[in-house]
From Swiss-Prot:
GO process annotations (BP): coenzyme A biosynthetic process
Keyword Acyltransferase: no
Binding site for ATP: S9, F10, H17, G93, L94, R95, E103, S128, R129, P130, I131, T132, A133, T134
Cofactor: Mg(2+)
EC numbers: 2.7.7.3
Catalytic activity: (R)-4'-phosphopantetheine + ATP + H(+) = 3'-dephospho-CoA + diphosphate
Keyword Transferase: yes
Species: Rhizobium johnstonii (strain DSM 114642 / LMG 32736 / 3841) (Rhizobium leguminosarum bv. viciae)
Pathway(s) of this molecule: Cofactor biosynthesis; coenzyme A biosynthesis; CoA from (R)-pantothenate: step 4/5
Protein name: Phosphopantetheine adenylyltransferase
């Protein structure tokens, strides 16, 4: 069974992330969504909240297929975490050329450290190309409508985080 590792902060998961996950299930039988935990960062959502939002978003987007997806935390090198979970593929979403430049550097470094793990680039769909979790958080914090950019569960969670 081919297992893919999809690392990110997912703070919060966006429609772009969901798009990449749907594509990832076309190249791997199992996908591990890996939430990076960085002690120096203060995320909007806790690990537990992000994991639950991922599960709820995927249940909505992929009814009946969520058994092929698991959610874990990691705080070490991506390749080490992927190896720990038995993954042989790293999934990376690409929105534009800037993402490609950065991701090619990372893929090269990861390949040197872990030649047994291959990076797969999956292009974002047209509708999700402009979406970033950072922009979603900023727009939501200013009271903007982010419903076109995030799953319903995330929209509800963002709304509840916003002060009245």
């Amino acid at each position: 069974m081919t297992t893919a590792f999809y690392p990110g902060s997912f703070d919060p998961i966006t429609n772009g992330h969901v798009d990449v996950l749907v594509q990832a299930l076309n190249v791997a039988e199992k996908v591990i969504v890996a939430i990076g935990i960085h002690p120096g960062k203060a995320p909007l959502f806790s690990f537990e909240e992000r994991a639950e939002l991922i599960r709820r978003s995927l249940a909505e987007a992929l009814p009946g297929k969520t058994g092929d997806i698991s959610v874990v935390a990691f705080d070490n090198l991506v390749v080490d975490a992927a190896r720990t979970h038995g993954a042989t593929l790293l999934i990376r979403g690409l929105r534009d050329g800037t993402d490609l430049d950065y991701e090619m550097q990372m893929a090269g470094m990861n390949r040197t450290m872990a030649p047994d793990i291959q990076t797969i680039f999956l292009p974002a769909g047209t509708a999700s190309r402009p979406i970033t979790a950072t922009l979603v958080r900023q727009i939501a914090a200013m009271g903007g409508d982010v419903s076109a950019f995030v799953p319903a569960a995330v929209l509800q969670a963002l709304t509840s985080k916003r002060p009245n």
